[in-house]
Amino acid sequence: MAAEFNNDWDDLLKDEFKKEYYLNLRKFLINEYKTQKIHPSMYDIFNALKFTPYKDVKVVILGQDPYHGPNQAHGFSFSVKPGVQTPPSLRNMFKELNSDLGCYIPNNGFLESWAKQGILLLNTVLTVREGQANSHKGKGWEIFTDRVIELLNKREEPIVFILWGRNAISKEALITNPIHKIIKSVHPSPLSATRGFFGSKPFSKTNDFLVSINKEPIDWQIPNI
């Protein structure tokens, strides 16, 4: 659980793994994985950072904690493994994508192709007990992921930060560098999507910003499997 990302995150985060909070978190997780059903698999915990190197990050989509149902979470915010039913919040994201950019609604919720294009799909807490939302809250992950956000904030190339819902918007305080673009609204969850997520056009706004800084826009279309 001291990760190797095999990219530039290794050097940027190596000191975090030596800190007391992380050593305590590691101890906690070793016991949790031994005694409880934990998601995602320990081999998938850091997928967001493994798939999207620091230098390649164009967009950050912040989530809260991983899906806590069987076979859903695989280390990316909002994404589920192939063959798993698309969860309600992601269904609403696809609906907004359809009305915003005309993307067809895919038959899966596997977002790996976004990660490969420079979208860091980062949850603020990276593990969870099965069936128990927020069960690993306050164990140290927030310190680690705040550090990731702080490092991204320091970057000299602009990044789009997409913050949906109160938990994600609370991280806006860490994004102090004026070169970055912040796009925020209520969460795409069915509980709040009709109060300002639908019609907010976050996907086209992201691409408009990327084009304005001479970056390749994101191909948001998730293909059918």
UniProtKB/Swiss-Prot annotation:
Keyword flag Signal: no
Listed name of the protein: Uracil-DNA glycosylase
GO terms (BP aspect): base-excision repair, AP site formation via deaminated base removal
GO MF terms, alphabetically ordered: uracil DNA N-glycosylase activity
First-level EC class: hydrolase
SMART domains: UDG, UreE_C
Subcellular location: Cytoplasm
One GO cellular component term: cytoplasm
Family note: Belongs to the uracil-DNA glycosylase (UDG) superfamily. UNG family.
Alphabetical list of Gene3D superfamilies matching this protein: Uracil-DNA glycosylase-like domain
Enzyme Commission number(s) from the entry: 3.2.2.27
Catalytic reaction list: Hydrolyzes single-stranded DNA or mismatched double-stranded DNA and polynucleotides, releasing free uracil
Lineage: Bacteria, Bacillati, Bacillota, Clostridia, Eubacteriales
Organism listed in the record: Clostridium perfringens (strain 13 / Type A)
Main location: cytoplasm
Function: Excises uracil residues from the DNA which can arise as a result of misincorporation of dUMP residues by DNA polymerase or due to deamination of cytosine.
Active site: D65 (proton acceptor)
Keyword annotations of the record: Cytoplasm, DNA damage, DNA repair, Hydrolase
Entry-linked PROSITE patterns: U_DNA_GLYCOSYLASE
SUPFAM superfamilies (alphabetical): Uracil-DNA glycosylase-like (SSF52141)
